[in-house]
């Protein structure tokens, strides 16, 4: 399929996707029939969309195009109410978090969808292992060239986004010692990590043509980069965050990305170059392994900075942009989180350290999601 032309969209508009876990009480393992829930709610959603993701234990909630985080929060709140009622009617529960703490990938059933079945054929068991749950945020752009500039700018802050959203320390019944373990799942994919370097949209079109020769890439949706342009929407899509445990944190993360995008495209503070990515995977690893306690390294100067310190610096820089787009509440909430030194991964570990079981942890996550 050829790459579509870049659809011009209103700059800084917002779209958010949340991949949710569908679980069976009282054991709280993943359920394998999200199709039943989708059928139950499809005529009751007035804004946004509830749809499939890769496997039958995943339920995706997606907003429409929103002007700001308040509109997105309203849509999510309405969807949440409908989905929770349908889940209760079918004796199921819903929760966030980047990984199910004790699920077995071998049990996961890929959705009966042509694209997902083709992906299963291409990638085999990797697709079943990819039953992990993330938050994706789209930001509108006026042109393809703006999208490429924004993608490179946002890539500088991938460690910050990962650390702030970290919510997957447990996998296969084990403490992984990572703050988010979810990003590691994609390391075997040939398109894992950052997009290959291009400097403008014309070069991106050439890149996509080259990738399509592999026969594994039929559309932009087949690319698993940390951040990717979405020409059919006219957006840049950030894909590195775990699904948070609460709607409020999901909205705050979206506000952070929207405000950062506004700052990047209005101030143009960087002259991007390929060398910017020299230490990308090392800095990304620091955020995954240590969360906010990680240390990132500047590829140009060799300077090393605590991620906590650099995140506070970012929040300060984007505060005026956040004010202009109505996202100040998100930046203030994230500032409090950074100062506290906590993320959701640490809260999960604290629950287990206090004697809680992993089954009890998932039960707690369901209560948190329903109560937010």
Curated annotation (Swiss-Prot):
InterPro entries on file: GCL_type2/YbdK_subfam, GCS2, Gln_synth/guanido_kin_cat_dom, YbdK
Any one GO MF annotation of this record: ATP binding
Biological processes per GO annotation: modified amino acid biosynthetic process
Catalytic activity: L-cysteine + L-glutamate + ATP = gamma-L-glutamyl-L-cysteine + ADP + phosphate + H(+)
Keyword Acetylation applies: no
Domain of life: Bacteria
Enzyme class name: ligase
Protein EC: 6.3.2.2
Record keywords, A-Z: ATP-binding, Ligase, Nucleotide-binding
Record carries keyword Glycoprotein: no
SUPFAM superfamilies: Glutamine synthetase/guanido kinase (SSF55931)
Quaternary organization: Homodimer.
Family membership noted in the UniProt record: Belongs to the glutamate--cysteine ligase type 2 family. YbdK subfamily.
Function statement: ATP-dependent carboxylate-amine ligase which exhibits weak glutamate--cysteine ligase activity.
Protein name, as recorded: Putative glutamate--cysteine ligase 2
Gene, per the UniProt record: ybdK
């Amino acid at each position: 399929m050829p790459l579509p032309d870049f659809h011009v969209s209103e700059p800084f508009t917002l779209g958010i996707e949340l991949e949710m876990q569908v679980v069976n009480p009282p054991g709280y393992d993943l359920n394998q029939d999200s199709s039943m829930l989708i059928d139950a709610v499809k005529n009751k959603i007035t804004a946004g969309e509830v749809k499939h993701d890769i496997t039958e234990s995943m339920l995706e909630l997606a907003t429409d195009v929103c002007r700001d985080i308040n509109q997105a929060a309203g849509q999510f709140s309405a969807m949440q109410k409908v989905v929770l009622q349908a889940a209760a009617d079918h004796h199921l529960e819903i929760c966030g978090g980047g990984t199910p703490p004790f699920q077995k990938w071998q049990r996961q059933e890929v959705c009966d969808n042509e694209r997902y079945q083709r992906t299963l054929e291409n990638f085999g068991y990797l697709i079943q292992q990819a039953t992990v749950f993330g938050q994706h945020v789209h930001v509108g752009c006026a042109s393809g060239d703006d999208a490429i500039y924004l993608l490179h700018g946002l890539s500088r802050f991938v460690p910050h986004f990962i650390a702030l959203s970290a919510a997957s320390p447990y996998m296969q019944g084990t403490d992984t010692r990572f703050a988010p373990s979810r990003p590691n799942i994609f390391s075997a994919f040939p398109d894992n990590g950052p997009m290959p370097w291009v400097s403008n949209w014309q070069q991106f079109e050439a890149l996509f043509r080259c990738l399509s020769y592999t026969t594994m890439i039929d559309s932009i949706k087949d690319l698993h980069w940390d951040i990717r342009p979405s020409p059919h929407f006219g957006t840049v899509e950030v894909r590195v965050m775990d699904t948070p445990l609460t709607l409020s944190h999901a909205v705050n993360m979206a506000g952070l990305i929207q405000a950062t995008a506004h700052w990047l495209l209005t101030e143009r503070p960087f002259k991007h170059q390929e060398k910017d990515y020299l230490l990308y995977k090392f800095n990304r690893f620091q955020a995954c392994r240590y969360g906010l306690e990680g240390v990132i390294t500047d590829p140009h100067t060799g300077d090393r900075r605590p991620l906590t310190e650099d995140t506070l610096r970012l929040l300060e820089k984007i505060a005026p942009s956040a004010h202009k787009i109505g996202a100040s509440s998100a930046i203030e909430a994230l500032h409090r989180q950074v100062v506290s030194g906590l993320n959701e991964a640490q809260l999960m570990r604290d629950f287990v350290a206090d004697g809680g079981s992993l089954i009890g942890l998932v039960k707690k996550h369901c209560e948190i999601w329903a109560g937010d």
